[in-house]
């Protein structure tokens, strides 16, 4: 894994945006969490759309036509889903960029998305570029994954990059939320990413 040159002193960075203010989804999660923590007996809380967060995964299409994926997202929104999470090359398969589908869902459905960020396919430079682009384009919810090995897909001899693993990307995003890149350099503003990973990332 790449270990960027570290500055001699730990950079101070900016104060991160509070979790509840990063996205609409993070605001709802924060409210639900506080209600559960403060409840005398959280097991007796009635599950309603207001106190339960719903995220459903929709995969990008394997070709050029995103219609079925967008219609699936539309149906899920009408059914009460809060957010659509969009996979990044699941099972090491070739599909449309999840960044593209995320933008279509945002534009056509005005629905928040969670973008999967996979360590497998991008080096340290590409990961940073794609994350900064996603932020500028309004995608602030991330699920960080290491990624399935290429041998599971149609191109078993494809090169897996893995400059960073999922934990390394989480650390990088944490730095971005303080306005600092992996080399410790400030870039003038802080991102407001809400990031998550799997229990076995």
Question: Each predicted region: which residue ranges?
Answer:
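Domain-level signal for soluble alpha/beta catalytic cores
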Residues: 1-201
């Amino acid at each position: 894994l790449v270990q960027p040159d570290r500055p001699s002193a730990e950079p101070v960075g900016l104060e991160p945006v509070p979790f509840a203010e990063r996205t609409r989804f993070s605001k709802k999660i924060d409210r639900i969490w506080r209600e559960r923590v403060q409840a005398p007996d959280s097991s007796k809380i009635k599950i309603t759309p207001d106190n339960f967060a719903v995220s459903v995964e929709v995969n990008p299409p394997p070709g050029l036509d995103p219609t079925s994926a967008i219609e699936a997202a539309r149906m899920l929104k009408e059914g009460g889903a809060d957010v659509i999470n969009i996979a990044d090359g699941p099972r090491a398969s070739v599909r449309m960029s999840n960044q593209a589908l995320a933008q279509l869902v945002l534009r056509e459905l005005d629905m928040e998305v969670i973008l999967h960020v996979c360590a497998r396919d991008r080096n340290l430079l590409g990961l940073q570029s794609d994350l900064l682009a996603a932020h500028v384009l309004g995608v602030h919810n991330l699920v960080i994954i290491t990624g399935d090995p290429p041998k599971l897909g149609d191109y078993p001899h494809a090169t897996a990059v893995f400059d960073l693993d999922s934990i390394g990307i989480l650390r990088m995003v944490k730095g971005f939320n303080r306005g600092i890149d992996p080399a410790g350099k400030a870039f003038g503003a802080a991102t407001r990413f809400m990031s998550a990973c799997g229990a076995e990332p």
